[in-house]
Amino acid sequence: MIDNILFDLIEREAKRERENIELIASENFVSSDVRQAVGSVLTNKYAEGYPSKRYYGGCSVVDDIENLAISRAMELFGASYANVQPHSGSQANMAAIMSLIKPGDKILGMELSHGGHLTHGSKVSFSGMFFDAYSYGVSRDSEMIDYDDVKNIAKACRPNLIIAGASSYSREIDFKKFREIANEVSAYLLCDIAHTAGLVATGFHNSPIDVAHLTTSTTHKTLRGPRGGLILAGKEFNTMINYNNKERTLDSAVNSCVFPGTQGGPLMHVIAGKAVAFKEALNKEFKDYISRVIENTKAMAEYFISEGLRIVSGGTDNHLFLVDLSGLGITGADAEKILESVNITLNKNAIPFDSKNPSVASGIRIGAPAITSRGLNRDDSIKVAHFIIRALKTKSTDELRKIKQEVIGFISSFDMP
């Protein structure tokens, strides 16, 4: 029996995606091959454990699939080790953190309101509940990471683990400087490249793989794969560490912390989708795509600046940027609602040293991965920025209706992947 109610809802979502300009920096559109893999019969298979070490029979095919995903991930990032089982970036971070340190140890991560992530020490996350969390932020003047300040904080709190990475920071992060700081205070270094993995894989950003003890990522966002997580290691993969009161290699500790430590059976259909996405990212076309993402992001940021709006840190080096809306006299929450009414989707976002509650926020976050996947170029991206400014400045309901129709007509001319 066909579930008409559910499939009608899915079709409504497909229509929404076709007719909306998608600017949420953490979202993207996967290929039909990725969707086919994720929607395959592999969803039927339980496969607790790892290839050749399963707790169930009938795993020979999924062993080959997981090994394929692992080998492609290692090739893509130049890694010596990869675990493709984490269900999400947050679960990848949980496993990575808990393989390196124990509950009660000290973590130093980027302040959430300055661009960090919940799993980097926020009190509402496991990382802040189970660990003694400290934070670093950006300079009030430059709104960029001040590495001397990070060093001073690290010397003061002596963390067991330093986390480098962000969810709303528009500048390239110097992972080598973070490793120097970690070495100085005898801390482990975890680099979270969930947002910039596509830029790292294609060489547009420096790679932390052989710099950090562990690197984590999501497999969606700029990697354009299915929603999921990934843990990588470079030359530190066989470093001996104390895990659960036993001396073992880092890769072995991570494997144990993913399963059985924090997860049960892996999602084999999603791992297959990851394998497809890694293969796609190894092609030259993907590097061209990331180049266009960066170009489109910079074009939008520059247009906002030319129209008198302030961009946090003055610009962007990656796939996203933050707009301070204080000059327009509206909040991020206001802007999110206004723009959704004209079929432009993005999110409200706190800006550094924001005086407003995060649920209201003074800014918005804008990203170009999804629109670039639909084929928008630099000029198209500037047009998108123009739509946004028109919508945020108008006081006319009729004008908003007009903008919505223009947006639908414009974005509908671009195919979905």
UniProtKB/Swiss-Prot annotation:
Recite the lineage of the species: Bacteria, Pseudomonadati, Spirochaetota, Spirochaetia, Spirochaetales
Name the pathway it acts in: One-carbon metabolism; tetrahydrofolate interconversion; Amino-acid biosynthesis; glycine biosynthesis; glycine from L-serine: step 1/1
GO MF terms listed in the record are: glycine hydroxymethyltransferase activity; pyridoxal phosphate binding
Q: Which organism is it from?
A: Borrelia duttonii (strain Ly)
Looking at the UniProt record, the site noted as Plays an important role in substrate specificity sits at 220
Give GO BP annotations, semicolon-separated: glycine biosynthetic process from serine; tetrahydrofolate interconversion
Q: Extract the NCBIfam families matched here.
A: PRK00011.1
Its protein name is Serine hydroxymethyltransferase
Which top-level enzyme class is recorded in the Swiss-Prot or TrEMBL entry? transferase
| Purpose of the protein | Catalyzes the reversible interconversion of serine and glycine with tetrahydrofolate (THF) serving as the one-carbon carrier. This reaction serves as the major source of one-carbon groups required for the biosynthesis of purines, thymidylate, methionine, and other important biomolecules. Also exhibits THF-independent aldolase activity toward beta-hydroxyamino acids, producing glycine and aldehydes, via a retro-aldol mechanism.
Question: Where does this protein hold (6S)-5,6,7,8-tetrahydrofolate?
Answer: 112, 116-118, 247
Name the encoding gene, please: glyA
Stated family: Belongs to the SHMT family.
Q: Does the keyword Transport apply?
A: no
Gene3D superfamilies annotated for this entry?
Aspartate Aminotransferase, domain 1 (3.90.1150.10), Type I PLP-dependent aspartate aminotransferase-like (Major domain) (3.40.640.10)
Which residues are recorded as modified (N6-(pyridoxal phosphate)lysine)?
A: 221
Cited InterPro entries: PyrdxlP-dep_Trfase (IPR015424), PyrdxlP-dep_Trfase_major (IPR015421), PyrdxlP-dep_Trfase_small (IPR015422), Ser_HO-MeTrfase (IPR001085), Ser_HO-MeTrfase-like (IPR049943), Ser_HO-MeTrfase_PLP_BS (IPR019798), SHMT-like_dom (IPR039429)
EC number annotated for this UniProt entry = 2.1.2.1
Q: Which cellular components does GO assign to this protein?
A: cytosol
